[in-house]
Amino acid sequence: TLWNTITDYNRLAAFIPDMVSSRIISSPGTPKRVEQIADAGLFAFIMPDRVVLAMEEQPGQSLRFRAVSGKVASMSGEWRIVGDRAPVTLYYYAHVLPLTPLPPLVSDYFIESEVRTRFEAVGNEAERRMR
């Protein structure tokens, strides 16, 4: 299902481009923390190449996240699933504030491109799992 795809934290790197690793680093029974490492290449100054996210899950409905450490000034967002049966709609919102301020045209273009690529990868993986 879509929910299982977006919360498959330990396998996200298997289907999201440029994500080197993603793993739960918190202990069972504590608030969920996920460390993600990406290969941002030349754009590491825009997108964090390492971040630890605090996850807040509302199973089957929404997943909120915020950076608690890493190479980013601020990062937060949400995945939201609307609909109980197919077709469902997946919404994604994120606010990323890089450590290094850049011209908006540069950072906005790159972030939009990265988000689109990752969003499409999640959608493709969810569809693959439903077959």
Across the structure, where does each feature detected by a protein language model lie?
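Hydrophobic ligand-binding cavity/cleft-lining segments
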Residues: 1-29
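Glycine-rich portal/gate segments that line the openings of hydrophobic small-molecule binding cavities
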Residues: 23-71, 120-131
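Short amphipathic alpha-helical segments
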Residues: 1-4, 110, 114, 118
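Alpha-helix N-cap/helix-start motif
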Residues: 15, 44-45, 74, 104
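Hydrophobic pocket/interface hotspot
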Residues: 2-5, 12, 55, 92, ...
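Short intrinsically disordered, low-complexity coil segments enriched in acidic
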Residues: 1-4, 36, 46, 88, ...
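Beta-strand/loop substructures that line and gate deep hydrophobic ligand-binding cavities in soluble
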Residues: 67-115
